[in-house]
């Protein structure tokens, strides 16, 4: 029995109580069920009403469709007649197995019999279950309308007066959402134990926070992070949102088992499937699929090697009108959302296809007026045929550009964020296949005919490549071949490329500079472009983060004056054991983190500015995950954005004043706290002096008597008299300074 959301508490936050091992799910799974005899029957409605003499002819015509789902015969079709010897418009059909009956419902329900009649196919068991006496009221009763309940503002965090960003922090068994406060400690928004069992994930525009459980996923949002939606998918382990947050895809290695009579959005349509595409607004599945990449069964293990899970299994077009999946080596299937029907009723057959990627933005190609979405794919060398890169226009499925490649070992497709370019990274082997090298085939998508520029000056293999967001520059990392048995990986080289200055359009891509003898293996561009962090992650010996500026405002080297870049290393910092680097959505801050999912040494996260200044170090026990909350695209037009940039210096003055005011407030708070502590100390002294004066008066001592001498001359009090001396020490901070050494 698959897990259900019913097993979660109301708040989904409390610890699970310890229980004895429950074998009920195994018993239910392997329980021998008695054959009830009706599982093989289906009922077909929507048939033409015909006289008795035409009934057999109709049955023969109907069998053509019925046989497509399973084995049946004329004798297994019963079409009842009324007292006028006319058919009733429905028939009972028996299949050989219950599985064939289920297949008939899935394949034939809603299909047209002719121009005037559409089949409605249901299992006889379902009709008996739901249409039984007492299940349906004879009189119509209007549904109860729930009172209107105002929903929470799902983008309330964008109205923060200080324009702060939020982030989610997963450590131990707790997940918290916090405001980033620059130099000051983060401000907590919400912090909950057992909020997720695997990981948390923001939607692309930051509206939803997804938590993952054995029962499925849940979406949270609003100022208080209330539960918004539940999507039951037993043992789900992967989640992917569509670009505009209208759909979410879930995947589990275990096929779904839908129980008879079970409640909830899952139906027999999802039985045996691994992938579900959900409509987030309605909370209902659009369609479910079997995973292509599951491991082969025991009988096939020798014939077919085990495959890795390809994720995301479904890839969305930029406008969410289409979603596609690939059957590696055979075809690409493109579906139209939200109906999820196959575009053109057929998959696109592409022999040997290995990978594909949609353009991340809707592209307006030169000379093309009709609407289109573009996807790029590649195929390897097959026999005497060369490897091939193709660009397809959707919905027409027209191949608008191809490029043949030779001596290919592997290909990676990299779209620029605006769809202006697509870089095809081609790893080539020599004819002897003893050495490897990489060259770049850059498609200029918006130009007429989609010309291709080749960058073949690279001598080594490219292990990482990244375009500048909303720009035309890129960074890549190369490395030489690793000697067999080498204990230390070879050094890497970091290369920066930029287009030549050429009037209003971008020229050819040229090398700006190469930094040799590095250990870097990862590239992280600021989401706003210009700044980039080149880091060494998942390493046991190097942990450096290099902060680069591609538009440095200082003097430009003579040899780079014709290029659209001025490269400058701003700072290098180290973070021991770093595994991840994340930019905030505004491009102002960078977080480097070391997750316990990779290693258990010095886990935690550090906050840096875009220029590499470390603002805080946060060692965190059992730290797992840090993710910034994304922001939706700006609502300002290009002209309004241009105006903001023009007046940026004026705005900066206002921001500087606000920062100074915030510091003054913080300093004022410190001074006020010190004054309060001092006043409490003085009040305590005054109270003690008053008590001392009362004691002197009670013992008849003069007020000006020497208290210290009197205390020295006083007789010692024995311990058995029950008296104790209470000593209180109060420390006062006179001054506190903080000095940052650059």
UniProtKB/Swiss-Prot annotation:
SMART domains: RRM. InterPro entries: EIF3B, eIF3B_RRM, Nucleotide-bd_a/b_plait_sf, RBD_domain_sf, RRM_dom, TIF_beta_prop-like, WD40/YVTN_repeat-like_dom_sf. Keywords: Cytoplasm, Initiation factor, Protein biosynthesis, Repeat, RNA-binding, WD repeat. It comes from the Eukaryota. PROSITE patterns: RRM. WD repeats lie at residues 193-230, 232-290, 304-345, 515-558, 573-611. GO terms for molecular function: identical protein binding; RNA binding; translation initiation factor activity; translation initiation factor binding. Gene3D superfamilies: 3.30.70.330, YVTN repeat-like/Quinoprotein amine dehydrogenase. Residues 40-126 form the RRM domain. GO terms for biological process: formation of cytoplasmic translation initiation complex. Residues 1-10 have a biased composition (Polar residues). GO terms for cellular component: cytoplasmic stress granule; eukaryotic 43S preinitiation complex; eukaryotic 48S preinitiation complex; eukaryotic translation initiation factor 3 complex, eIF3e; eukaryotic translation initiation factor 3 complex, eIF3m; multi-eIF complex. It is found in: Cytoplasm. Residues 1-20 are annotated as: Disordered. SUPFAM superfamilies: RNA-binding domain, RBD, Tricorn protease domain 2. RNA-binding component of the eukaryotic translation initiation factor 3 (eIF-3) complex, which is involved in protein synthesis of a specialized repertoire of mRNAs and, together with other initiation factors, stimulates binding of mRNA and methionyl-tRNAi to the 40S ribosome. The eIF-3 complex specifically targets and initiates translation of a subset of mRNAs involved in cell proliferation. Component of the eukaryotic translation initiation factor 3 (eIF-3) complex. Belongs to the eIF-3 subunit B family. This is Eukaryotic translation initiation factor 3 subunit B.
């Amino acid at each position: 029995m698959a897990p259900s959301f019913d097993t979660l508490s109301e708040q989904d936050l409390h610890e699970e109580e310890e229980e004895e091992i429950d074998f009920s799910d195994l018993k239910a799974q392997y329980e021998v069920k008695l054959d009830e005899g009706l599982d093989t029957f289906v009922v077909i409605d929507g048939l033409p009403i015909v006289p008795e003499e035409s009934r057999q002819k109709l049955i023969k015509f109907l069998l053509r469709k019925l046989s497509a789902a399973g084995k049946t015969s004329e004798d297994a079709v019963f079409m009842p007649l009324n007292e006028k010897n006319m058919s009733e418009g429905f028939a009972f059909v028996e299949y050989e197995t219950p599985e064939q009956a289920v297949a008939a419902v899935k394949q034939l329900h809603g299909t047209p019999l002719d121009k005037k009649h559409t089949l409605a196919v249901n299992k006889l068991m379902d009709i008996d279950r739901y249409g039984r006496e007492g299940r349906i009221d004879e009189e119509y009763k209007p549904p109860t309308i729930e009172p209107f309940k105002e929903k929470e503002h799902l983008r309330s965090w964008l109205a923060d007066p200080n324009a702060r960003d939020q982030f989610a922090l997963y450590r131990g068994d707790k997940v918290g959402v916090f405001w980033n406060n620059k130099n000051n400690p983060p401000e907590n928004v919400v912090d909950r134990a057992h909020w997720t069992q695997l990981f948390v994930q923001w939607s692309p525009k930051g509206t939803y926070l997804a938590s993952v459980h054995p029962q499925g996923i849940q979406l949270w949002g609003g100022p208080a992070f209330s539960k918004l939606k539940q999507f039951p998918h037993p043992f789900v382990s992967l989640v992917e949102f569509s670009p505009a947050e209208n759909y979410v895809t879930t995947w589990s290695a275990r096929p779904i088992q839908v129980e008879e009579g079970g409640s909830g959005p899952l139906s027999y349509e999802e039985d045996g499937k691994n992938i579900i595409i959900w409509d987030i607004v309605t909370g209902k599945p659009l369609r479910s699929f079997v995973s292509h990449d599951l491991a082969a069964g025991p009988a096939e293990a020798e014939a077919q090697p085990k495959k890795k899970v390809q994720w995301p299994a479904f890839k969305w077009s930029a406008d969410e009108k289409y979603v596609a999946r690939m059957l590696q080596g055979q075809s690409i299937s493109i579906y139209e959302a939200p109906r999820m029907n196959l575009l053109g009723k057929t998959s696109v057959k592409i022999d040997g296809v290995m990978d594909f990627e949609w353009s991340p933005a809707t592209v307006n190609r030169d000379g093309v007026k009709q609407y289109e979405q573009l996807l790029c794919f590649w195929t390897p060398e097959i026999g005497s045929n060369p490897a091939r890169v193709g660009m397809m226009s959707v919905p027409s499925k027209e191949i608008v550009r191809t490029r043949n490649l030779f001596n290919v070992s592997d290909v990676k497709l990299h779209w620029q964020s605006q769809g202006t370019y697509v870089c095809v990274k081609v790893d080539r082997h020599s004819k002897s296949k003893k050495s490897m090298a990489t060259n770049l085939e850059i498609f200029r998508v918006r130009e007429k005919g989609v010309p291709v520029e080749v960058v073949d000056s690279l001598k080594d293999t490219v292990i990482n490549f990244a375009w500048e967001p909303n720009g035309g520059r890129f960074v890549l990392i190369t490395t030489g071949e690793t000697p067999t048995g080498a204990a230390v990986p070879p050094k890497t080289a970091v290369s920066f490329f930029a287009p030549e200055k050429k009037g209003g359009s971008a020229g050819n891509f040229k090398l700006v500079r190469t930094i040799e003898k590095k250990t870097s293996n990862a590239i992280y561009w600021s989401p706003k472009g210009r700044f980039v962090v080149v880091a060494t992650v998942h390493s046991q010996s190097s942990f450096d983060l290099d902060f680069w500026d591609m538009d440095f405002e200082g003097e430009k080297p003579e040899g780079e004056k014709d290029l659209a870049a001025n490269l400058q290393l701003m700072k290098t910092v180290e973070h021991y054991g770093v595994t991840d680097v994340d930019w905030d959505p505004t491009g102002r801050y960078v977080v480097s983190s070391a997750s316990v999912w990779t290693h258990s040494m010095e886990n935690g996260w550090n906050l840096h500015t875009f220029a590499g200044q470390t603002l805080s170090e946060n060692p965190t026990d059992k730290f797992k995950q840090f993710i910034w909350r994304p922001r939706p695209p700006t609502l300002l037009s290009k002209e309004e954005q241009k105006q903001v940039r023009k007046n940026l210096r004026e705005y900066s003055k206002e921001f500087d004043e606000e920062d100074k005011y915030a510091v003054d407030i913080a300093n004022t708070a410190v001074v006020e706290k010190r004054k309060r502590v001092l006043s409490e100390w003085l009040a305590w002294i005054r109270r003690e002096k008053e008590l001392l004066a009362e004691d002197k008066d009670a013992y008849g001592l003069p007020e000006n008597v020497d208290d210290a001498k009197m205390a020295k001359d006083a007789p010692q009090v024995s311990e058995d008299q029950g008296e104790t001396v209470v000593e209180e020490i109060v420390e006062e901070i006179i001054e506190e300074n903080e000095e940052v050494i650059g």
